[in-house]
Amino acid sequence: MLSLHKTLEMPSADTALPGRAAPIPTAQTHFVNGHALKGPYPEGLETAIVAMGCFWGVERVFWKVPGVYVTAAGYAAGITPNPTYEEVCTGRTGHTEVVLVVFDPKVVTYEALLKTFWENHDPTQGMRQGNDIGTQYRSGLYVTSDAQAAAAAESKAAYQQALSARGLGTITTEIAPAGPFYFAEDYHQQYLAKNPNGYCGIGGTGVVCPIGLGVEG
């Protein structure tokens, strides 16, 4: 998941790649559970979009969470419409690698997913995650409602307290409204289920997120 053409600066609308009008081809069903990757999803389910570095490992973390109906690797928070992986890796689309998480809030809450998010990557690294460097590896939460926005901001503040108490850095995670989500190519979907020994760059700070624990810091 390393790009030969890395950039740490976000493109402008003028410098971003043009992309294309039609979506790129991808899988129709989830390789692990057989659910429809693109929906329609059962009534009552909600969606979350998270960015934690290379989406291969991130997706595996979330498809294992009880209450998660389906996951998908994709691109979001950028400019270029319907980008390819190669285009995203140039840094000229503005997108970050993300995972779409479709979940049943009666089984797993958004707050619980946030705890999983914070504890499974290092949100202080800016335009990188571990050895993966570039704007497409930045940390992000792309929210679909005011309630998600409030919960994301509250969790960020709580986790920052926990990190600061351990002498760790400042969170660089961006929290923004979810714009278009573009499904990644077929071979990226559920990659580590298809390739169990494949690359996984995911790793946390070792600091527990205090959400739902009844503790501060």
UniProtKB/Swiss-Prot annotation:
One of its GO terms (biological process) is protein modification process. The keyword Hydrolase does not apply. GO terms for cellular component: cytoplasm. It catalyses: L-methionyl-[protein] + [thioredoxin]-disulfide + H2O = L-methionyl-(S)-S-oxide-[protein] + [thioredoxin]-dithiol; [thioredoxin]-disulfide + L-methionine + H2O = L-methionine (S)-S-oxide + [thioredoxin]-dithiol. InterPro entries: Met_Sox_Rdtase_MsrA_dom (IPR002569), Met_Sox_Rdtase_MsrA_sf (IPR036509), MsrA_MetSO_reductase (IPR050162). One of its GO terms (molecular function) is peptide-methionine (S)-S-oxide reductase activity. Its EC number is 1.8.4.11. Keywords: Oxidoreductase. Coiled coil: none annotated. The active site is at residue 54. It comes from the Bacteria. It is an enzyme of class 1 (oxidoreductase). PANTHER family: MITOCHONDRIAL PEPTIDE METHIONINE SULFOXIDE REDUCTASE. Has an important function as a repair enzyme for proteins that have been inactivated by oxidation. Catalyzes the reversible oxidation-reduction of methionine sulfoxide in proteins to methionine. Belongs to the MsrA Met sulfoxide reductase family. This is Peptide methionine sulfoxide reductase MsrA 1. It comes from Caulobacter vibrioides (strain ATCC 19089 / CIP 103742 / CB 15). The gene is msrA1.
